[in-house]
């Protein structure tokens, strides 16, 4: 049975292209694998607070020296890390806000990127501690030209950041499904959604088969 962790970051529910395509991804996965376990963490309906000074102190305090106050400050981080550890597949859905990710997603990231929990450092090299997982990232941008050799590609700080971050944690198998020009005319929007939806259906069909035991 596959465990899929879905993270939604769009401030919008109605009219959100990233949420819509993530819905399609999940429904497609369940159509192929009805017994899959889907865990949803909506960072807008249930916002993750930004880390505090105590949270950071707790991250770098040896377990034997953790005070009750520090354990409380890192309890949410423990919970979020447990969720991603249990997951076989990670599905991130996020819009591009001002060329980068929403602050809600960054807050979640700051809770799950944690030394000796999701990455290690031996004094010379970093190593990710979450290997063997797949990640799919659905992104939405109002304008076009952010992907490939597009004129706005240098301004795309969503894909390269998330690609590096997930790899840093040991998740090397990352697939992006971007939809662009979501503020264009209706025909262009429909074409863009159809193309992204078709890609998702193809990805899901192949991914579910790969997840199943031989």
Curated annotation (Swiss-Prot):
Keywords from the named record: Flavoprotein, FMN, NAD, Oxidoreductase
Catalytic activity annotation: 2 a quinone + NADH + H(+) = 2 a 1,4-benzosemiquinone + NAD(+); N,N-dimethyl-1,4-phenylenediamine + anthranilate + 2 NAD(+) = 2-(4-dimethylaminophenyl)diazenylbenzoate + 2 NADH + 2 H(+)
GO MF assignments: electron transfer activity; FMN binding; oxidoreductase activity, acting on NAD(P)H as acceptor; oxidoreductase activity, acting on NAD(P)H, quinone or similar compound as acceptor
Needed cofactors: FMN
Class of the enzyme per the UniProt entry, highest EC level: oxidoreductase
Alphabetized InterPro entries for the sequence: Flavodoxin_fold, Flavoprotein-like_sf, FMN-dep_NADH:Q_OxRdtase_AzoR1, NADH:quinone_OxRdtase_FMN_depd
Catalytic activity, EC: 1.6.5.-, 1.7.1.17
UniProt family annotation: Belongs to the azoreductase type 1 family.
Subunit structure: Homodimer.
Alphabetized PANTHER family for the sequence: FMN-DEPENDENT NADH-AZOREDUCTASE 1, FMN-DEPENDENT NADH:QUINONE OXIDOREDUCTASE
Protein name, as recorded: FMN-dependent NADH:quinone oxidoreductase
Organism name: Bradyrhizobium sp. (strain ORS 278)
Source taxonomy: Bacteria, Pseudomonadati, Pseudomonadota, Alphaproteobacteria, Hyphomicrobiales
UniProt gene name: azoR
